[in-house]
Swiss-Prot record:
Family indicated by similarity: Belongs to the FliW family.
GO CC terms in record: cytoplasm
Gene name tied to this protein: fliW
KW NAD (keyword) present: no
Keyword Transport recorded: no
Function comment: Acts as an anti-CsrA protein, binds CsrA and prevents it from repressing translation of its target genes, one of which is flagellin. Binds to flagellin and participates in the assembly of the flagellum.
HAMAP family: FliW
BP-aspect Gene Ontology terms: bacterial-type flagellum assembly; regulation of translation
Localization (cell): Cytoplasm
Binding partners and assembly: Interacts with translational regulator CsrA and flagellin(s).
Record keywords, A-Z: Bacterial flagellum biogenesis, Chaperone, Cytoplasm, Translation regulation
Annotated protein name in UniProt: Flagellar assembly factor FliW
Length: 127
């Protein structure tokens, strides 16, 4: 699935088109169509309860009309063992399946203090 980037991933403002590749039921790969950049992402709902309001700026930018058509992912920094990998819950990637657009939505940390920028996956694994 190819997406047009409406609000860039921080530090990668040059990327305008990306492909979303499902790896399994938890992980996806976001691959730039402009260069060799790629990100491994996770379905946050597989780890925890995860809710936030999408600011109206992004709703307008991505022409969001039906939130049921959104897919939410979070970028992870992969480490070995996998449990040591960290998840960025502060800046989710929002994909609008209606019009194949995506944006990185940077959340207000004051409004969402429960979400961290580098939370280890092991914190969410039941022992």
């Amino acid at each position: 699935m190819t997406f047009s980037v409406k609000s860039p991933i921080l530090g990668f403002e040059h990327i305008k088109t990306m492909e979303l590749i499902e790896l399994d039921k938890f992980f996806v790969k976001l691959q730039s169509k402009d260069d060799e950049t790629s990100f491994t992402m996770i379905n946050p709902f597989a780890l925890r309860s995860y809710e936030f309001d999408i600011p109206s700026y992004y709703e307008e930018l991505m022409d969001i009309r039906d939130t049921s058509q959104l897919r939410i992912y979070n970028i992870i920094v992969v480490s070995l063992p996998l449990e040591k990998s960290t998840v960025n819950f502060v800046a989710p990637i929002v994909c609008n399946m209606d019009n194949m657009t995506l944006s990185q939505v940077v959340l207000d940390v004051g409004a969402y203090p429960q979400y961290g920028q580098a939370e280890p996956i092991e914190n969410f694994i039941q022992k």
